[in-house]
Amino acid sequence: MSLRFCFGPSGSGKSHRIYEEIMQRAAEEPGRNFLIIVPDQFTMQTQKDLVIRSDRDGILNIDVLSFGRLSHRILEEVGTKEMPVLDDTGKSLVLQKVAADLKEQLPAMGSLLHKQGYIHEVKSAISEFMQYGISTQDMDKLITSAQKRGALAMKLKDLKTLYRGFQDYIRDHFITTEETLDVLRRSLSKSKILKGSVVVFDGFTGFTPIQNRLIQELMRVCAETIVTVTIGVGEDCLLYT
């Protein structure tokens, strides 16, 4: 197991340098898997860039994946049984149901939830809570600290009520896309795809706590982990091992 960082300003060629290295190594080590993890919006473009750069007929041992696709790929490989995954649309529908059921317990937000886009905003907030490991107990602390700001405290109380109602509704029936990474983390050691592989993380400005936990576990399973890091303009682009 090794961890490497490639530092450089935006546009300095970090990705190009790493991709060239990965393609060369993939050709020299056909029995090793190379996984490049990028944000969702960059997967297609990264695949296209690699194919254009490749001087072979294909790149069979290189996979370009998002965190979500990595989760699907590995859980399918190891046969982990999981509950249906609730996507953003599903979350919004569940929240609409929960909000209707709990309307009397939502003095600050109850009359606003029918407005266009409001459920979407609540869903986004709850998604971030789950990504960053914020529990209803953590929200109690936020509510306490906001007591002197009456309107904010009331909205936080309502948001906590919706968050708890959402969790109660999906418990034992669904998992969210955020939770799939924790399911994946517990299954990594069973994966033959990941064992001895090289994993690259490129294009990220940072990682959530759930993603950090996954990366830590990946480092125990994979042979090598490489992370590109954007730094300020004017600083040297260095590759640290």
Regions found by a protein language model. Give the residues of each.
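Histidine-anchored nucleotide/phosphate-binding helix
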Residues: 22-24, 208-221
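Glycine-rich P-loop/Walker A and Walker A-like loops and their local beta1-loop-alpha1 context
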Residues: 3-29, 33-47
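Conserved helicase core region in the C-terminal RecA-like lobe
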Residues: 63-70, 198-207, 211, 226
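Accessory N-terminal region flanking or inserted into the helicase ATPase core
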Residues: 2-6, 10, 14, 101-203, ...
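Conserved phosphoryl-transfer catalytic core
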Residues: 224-235
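A general structural motif
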Residues: 1, 31-33, 194-197, 222-224
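Conserved P-loop NTPase-based nucleic-acid remodeling module centered on helicase motor cores
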Residues: 31-141, 147-150
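Conserved small/polar residues in nucleotide/adenosyl-binding loops
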Residues: 240-241
